[in-house]
Amino acid sequence: IMRKNIVIGKEKEEDLIKELSKRTDIKAERIKRLLELQDLTKKENSPVKILFDQIINLPRFKDFDLIDFPRIVSVEENFDLLNTPKDHSSRRETDTYYIDENHVLRTQMTVMWSFYLKNSEVLKKLETEGYIEALSLGIVFRKDEIDKSHYPAFHQVDGLYVCKKSKKVIT
């Protein structure tokens, strides 16, 4: 068993960023600045990358697939597919950065689940081997007032382990 690095296509994100770059409204300017922030999970020698590398190289996680997906995702991917209620406060413009009515800056790395579970190789592995496992780490965005303990961008790791009961019972 070997870890796979699965990179989800970012073409849609690139198109949305091109459209965003044409805008000059305050909301667009704020989002453009946030998108310029480095994802410290990918920056060599950053304390965040060092810590996350230690996590993903723990014996328990050494074979987990690593999922990299766009920073801009659809409302469906960020909320609907994770069963976030339509009236949940996290959907409000006061809590989430909306690019347009259908796209947001990702608010959590859990969003990777829908991308991962749609991958044909992943589904084949689940069928043949009885389990799948993945981690996703990266920068996420939430509207927070900046103070000593809050910033609108931070780094997060999320994991997923799914198995057939015949393979393992998780307690």
Model-derived segments and their meaning:
Residues 2-171:
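TRNA-recognition modules of translation machinery and tRNA-sensing kinases, especially anticodon-binding
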